[in-house]
């Protein structure tokens, strides 16, 4: 999603992870959501798709399934919309931690005195209905690690 200002760091991290694990990464950029149908059609034969969370989860999940592409996103809403899985920081925990920071600041702690923290809780959500529709079997070792399994 070229207009998304986070696409460059997103792709950079994806490329780094791909090269470290020996996985070939191919980028497909779009300018508008109306380009998604053509973009997904061009992905025929790919092993999997990682969808930027700034795109419509309903549309991208539907296109992933229609083109029989296993798909993942950092949006927890993605599997609920029909995508295969999401793996990302827990937004609920980020909001909670933000509120705790704000509380400390309002009580007089200088923001510069607070430690910088990254997300602590990472969530894995798997949609087994989509896995079955794609002819995939999710190993039990993955299912037991999932925070939520949609059946």
Residue ranges and their predicted role:
Residues 1-151:
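Short hydrophobic alpha-helices and adjacent helix-cap/hinge residues
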